[in-house]
Amino acid sequence: MKISIIGISQLTDFVLDNIINYSDEINIYSDSRNFDFENKNLTKKNVSIFTDKNIDDNLNKICKTSDVLFFLSDSDPFNVFSYKKCLMYNPSTKSVFQATDRDIYEMYKDKKYPVISPFNLKEDDYLYLIKE
């Protein structure tokens, strides 16, 4: 199973630690370098970290080559837009996105979207994507 994570935020480490044993290939894409995150995960053999200034332009390829996608940037508009764009490219891709604003999180949660948030995070909110 190929898992892709788009964005490095406070949730990325937590999610990565919980999914690391479920995949032989985890690719993490960020538009800027996070040296603390990179150094912490340098020795993990199944994790690759890519800096890509044009993530939005390469989203089609990422969506089509991933079995599971996590949109975990600190930008709620980017996460929501990318999630919906990915559904257009590949409707069968399993994905979840982060909403850091409580109102946005609750709005999407009420509409039954696959959304997670740092202030109300449960492993069950995203691990079902990998265990299916």
Which stretches of residues belong to each language-model region?
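Cytosolic regulatory regions of ion transport systems
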Residues: 1-132
